[in-house]
Amino acid sequence: MSQKRLSRVIYPGTFDPITNGHLDLIERAAQMFDEVIIAVAASPSKNTLFTLEERVEFARQVTSHLDNVSAKGFSGLLVDFAKAEKANVLIRGLRTTVDFEYEFGLTNMYRRLMPGLESVFLTPAEEHAFISSTLVREVAIHGGNVDEFVPAIVANALHQKKKI
């Protein structure tokens, strides 16, 4: 039986902001797959700290050392983006059982909307398991130091946002 190689994958998220935990998963996915597309969701229902353009640019800059990684913004359904990009695999990070419950439901919905779409789940490195964009934003908004949780360019942007 021949196996089809999973060569083009999507790592979707809001990435507001992209964290060291995200970057760890991206770097690991880049070693496993031929091409990784970071799909930055517009998420109009969320009150994001950074614009879609800023979030895409952060993703591009922090992954510039990875030749097989690109970042693109999208709005609408993720499955439509996956079809347009000719990708049939999603990379998702799982930090806790709560993440698993949520992702399990999403995976089943995605399969209904796009038969053949698979999800590959990666667990974070131990040092990143507690990091979330929400927590990083909260710490930054209240004047805390987030330098160890996000890439330097993102930390600088968060420090600038505090001054506004």
UniProtKB/Swiss-Prot annotation:
Spell out the InterPro entries in the cross-references. Cyt_trans-like, PPAT, Rossmann-like_a/b/a_fold
Q: Which EC class heads this enzyme's classification?
A: transferase
Q: Which positions in this protein are listed as binding ATP?
A: 14-15, 22, 93-95, 103, 128-134
Q: Which GO terms describe its cellular component?
A: cytoplasm
The pathway to which it is assigned is: Cofactor biosynthesis; coenzyme A biosynthesis; CoA from (R)-pantothenate: step 4/5
List its EC numbers: 2.7.7.3
Note whether Aminoacyl-tRNA synthetase occurs among the keywords: no
Q: Name one Pfam family in it.
A: CTP_transf_like
Coarsely, its chief localization is: cytoplasm
* Annotated site residues (Transition state stabilizer) in this chain: 22
Q: Which UniProt keywords apply?
A: ATP-binding, Coenzyme A biosynthesis, Cytoplasm, Magnesium, Nucleotide-binding, Nucleotidyltransferase, Transferase
A GO biological-process term: coenzyme A biosynthetic process
The Swiss-Prot or TrEMBL record lists the needed cofactor(s) as: Mg(2+)
The function of this protein is:
Reversibly transfers an adenylyl group from ATP to 4'-phosphopantetheine, yielding dephospho-CoA (dPCoA) and pyrophosphate.
Q: What is this protein called?
A: Phosphopantetheine adenylyltransferase
The encoding gene = coaD
